[in-house]
Design a protein with these regions (language model features):
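N-terminal catalytic or cofactor-binding beta/alpha core of small enzyme domains
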Residues: 1-143, 154-155, 161-165, 169-197, ...
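Acidic, Ser/Thr-rich peripheral helices and adjacent loops at domain boundaries
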Residues: 201-219
Length: 290
């Protein structure tokens, strides 16, 4: 669908017997489009060397694919950062670009009249674990910020041409910010498709805006034993992968006390506020440390 919005040129690179195409926008931003045999995370040992060979110096990488899963919501345009929360292996993340993409997806969804679709974020994860695509320790070996960009979660949604076009058009806006002062936050707790975190991006008013990247849901805090000392080390590793660091930690109010305590300890370590998710609706009430 990207060919509807840009004139693509051949780069001279071939991956999986497919030519890699490129587009340079009026601002000089260059986009490469790579068609692969299978989703990259399904065979990381194969694709990681290719990514590092051709795209180790790029600013952002996006894996455009479909979303599915048991009890997964349908008619969604979704974005998530990469990482295996249980083991504490996180990919690089760029909050500003994720925010730009989410805003563009919401704008294009509305303009296309896709009233039955919603823009959502998912908890940080890596589908390589599900598809035996490699060991999670491979994730940090790709240093470029990387996200999954998906349409879900049924064949009807996957074949929806208007949704595909809205998503494709959004890709070209990933470097286009709106000039607001951004507050990058680590999001912790809640469910896999936690609405509080994406709403913080889509519904922020005024000159202060939230940017999100890694989202650690309640279920993987528990299975990853994040209440233990090793859990704190995993949290620090997570923060260190976020470009520009973080300005605060938003935790879901439903978290158990021991996890809230961990977030407050982590916040003290970085000299930033930790706050309940309800405050995401009132950014001016947060005790930011400028």
């Amino acid at each position: 669908e990207v060919t509807e919005f840009a004139n693509l040129e051949n780069t001279g690179i071939t991956i999986d017997e497919n030519p890699v195409l490129k587009y340079k926008d009026p601002m000089g931003n260059e986009f490469h489009f790579v068609r692969t045999y299978k989703p990259v995370c399904h065979d990381y040992p194969y694709y990681l060397p290719i990514m590092n060979k051709y795209y180790s110096d790029f600013d952002m990488a996006g894996l455009v694919t479909w979303h599915e899963g048991q009890n997964a919501p349908d008619k969604v345009l979704t974005v998530h950062s990469t990482g295996d929360v249980d083991s504490g292996n996180f990919g690089a993340a760029e909050p500003a670009y994720i925010r730009n993409l989410l805003l563009a997806m919401e704008k294009n969804r509305a303009e296309a009249g896709l009233d039955s679709f919603r823009v959502v974020t998912e908890a940080t994860h890596w589908s390589g674990m599900m598809y035996n695509g490699g060991h999670p320790e491979l994730i940090p070996e790709y240093k470029v910020p990387i996200i999954d960009i998906e349409i879900g979660s049924t064949t009807e949604s996957w074949s929806d041409g208007a949704a595909a076009k809205a998503m494709a058009k959004s890709l070209f806006s990933i470097f286009k910010g709106d000039g607001k002062k951004l507050y990058s936050i680590l999001c912790v707790g809640g469910v896999h498709f936690e609405p509080a975190f994406v709403n913080a991006v889509l519904q922020t008013e005024g000159d202060k805006a939230f940017a999100i990247s890694h989202i650690i849901p309640n279920q993987w805090l528990v299975s990853g034993k994040y209440e233990e000392p090793e859990g704190m080390e995993k949290l620090k590793k997570c923060v260190e992968t976020i470009n520009g660091g973080i300005k605060g930690i938003a935790f879901h109010d439903g978290l158990k006390g021991m996890y809230k305590d961990q977030m407050r300890t982590l916040a003290k370590e970085y000299n930033i506020p930790a706050f309940k998710h309800q405050l995401l609706r009132r950014p001016n009430d947060i005790a930011w440390i400028e």
